[in-house]
Amino acid sequence: MNPSDIETIELLSPAAPAQAPRPLFILLHDAGAAAVDMLELGRLLGDAFAESAGLLPQGLTGSAADGESLAALAGRVEALAAYVRLQQQRFGVLQSDTALAGLGAGSTLALALGGAHDGLVGRVLAFGGGYAVWPAAAPALTTLHLLHGADDSVASVARIRADFAHLMELGADATLDVVSSAGHGLHPAVMDQAVTRLQTCVPLRFWKSL
């Protein structure tokens, strides 16, 4: 898959500089869904971060959430990594100023990239999804935000709590927010909490550098 050939919806604010928008958001749709399904989140992030740019690629997640082999997932991770690097170079954006968000299978892909390519993005926001396989080590240069609906019937909140507990055992820089009365998908309260995390949560790596 050539990263330059991936169909992408672009949300570019007039207030954002032509080069080095901050942050650069890349939003991954769920399996079997479409990039347009991430528009509401993309617009919310654009309103909250006036100098940001949002990219919504089509098809990187694939068409099936369950049953995908680990080898297939690894292939998608590498395709995503190539896409992220291309866009960072295009916009002149630092890795630390890049945030990768995903819904469902998109969040599984985003978390897998965070483990395979530590620091390629500064933050991962995982909505309604978790790990395909637990990582053996925590990323040192990527902050992880798990955001979940308490009534999610696709990915149980118990599973996501277990993911988070494992991350804490590894010493990861991670947060978990469970929103009551929210199911699977981009519930407004879940999206609002994501914005709050982005605006208020200083990555642990910055504190350690002081």
Stretches with model-predicted labels:
Residues 145-148, 152:
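Short beta-strand/loop motif that positions the catalytic acidic residue
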Residues 2-93:
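Serine-hydrolase catalytic machinery in alpha/beta-hydrolase-like enzymes
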